[in-house]
Every structure is written in C-alpha cells, then in structure tokens.
C-alpha cells in the first residue's frame, strides 16, 4: 500500500523527486501506464526478495575458510580464478537455491500486484496468480481455478526437483 502512495502520479513522492531533479517535466502514472506498470511490479518484487537473498549469499560465503582464499592468493590466482575455482563451486548450490526460491516467490506473488494494479492496465500485470484468483472468486469457475493452480504447483514441483539436484551436489574444492 505504501508503494501505491509513493508512486501516485499527482501527490506521490517519486514523481516529486523526479521533477525536482529535472528528470521529468510531467508526472508519470507508473501504475496506470502499461509501459511502466510491469517493470515497477518486477522491481518491487525484487526489492522484497533482495534482503533474503543477501542473507543467504552471506551465509554461503561465510562457510568458505579464509585459508582457502589465502592459499589461492599465494598460488598467484587472480580474482577471476578465485571466483570461478573457489567461490562459485561452493556458493553455486546456494545460488541455485536462491534462483528456485525467487521463481517460487514470483509465481506466488499475488498480493503485491493485486494491491498495486489488480492486473491492469490493459492486462499488462495480469499474472497467473491473479488469473487463478479471478477464475475462483470473480467468475466463480472454481474447477478452472483449481486446474490452473494444480498446473502451477506441478510446474513448481518439477522445477524443485531439477534445482534440487544442484542443491545437494557434493562440493569439492
């Protein structure tokens, strides 16, 4: 709800800041313009997931012993080699896990988009969770809604199995 107020075209602080800085002359209706609405929703979804992703990555990187970094530097490894030969093999499963969580988070993100745009303008932010909700509660086609939800659930389970293979892979450095 806060973002809806911040992005409001006439009184929102985002438009006021952009005008004061001189980036725009006229107010932009971020949530009412199909050119902006989806990008704004994607950005806000990213902002919701970002702190959790940083926490996961920092925990994955804290597992790497400092001695390994020092040993690679003594051996003359460049930062690129340290990244490709030390950090990515150890943090790779966590990156894969974060990717999977991001996909699940995005597929299940109903409330943000519904509160901001309700799937509009011109269906530019009309996502699968909103379709499932509208089929069930606006059109009262519960069977179709359940079928769609089952398909999304099956897809997420299949993705979970694929990503799971990389989560539990034994890492040797």
Describe each PLM feature range:
Residues 1-173:
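A structural signal for multi-pass alpha-helical bundles of membrane permease subunits
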């Amino acid at each position: 709800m806060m973002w809806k107020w911040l992005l409001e075209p006439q009184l929102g602080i985002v438009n006021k800041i952009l005008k004061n800085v001189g980036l725009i002359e006229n107010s932009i209706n971020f949530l009412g313009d199909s050119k902006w609405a989806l990008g704004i929703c994607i950005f806000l979804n990213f902002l919701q997931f970002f702190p959790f992703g940083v926490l996961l990555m920092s925990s994955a990187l804290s597992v790497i012993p400092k001695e390994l970094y020092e040993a690679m530097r003594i051996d003359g490894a460049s930062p690129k080699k340290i990244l490709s030969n030390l950090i990515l093999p150890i943090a790779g499963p966590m990156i894969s896990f974060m990717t999977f969580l991001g996909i699940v988070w995005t597929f299940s993100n109903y409330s943000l988009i519904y509160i901001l745009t309700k799937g509009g303008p011109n269906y530019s932010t009309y996502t699968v969770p909103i379709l499932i909700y509208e089929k069930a509660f606006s059109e009262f086609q519960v069977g179709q809604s359940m079928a769609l939800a089952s398909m999304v659930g099956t897809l997420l389970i299949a993705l979970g199995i694929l990503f799971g293979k990389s989560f539990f892979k034994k890492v040797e450095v």
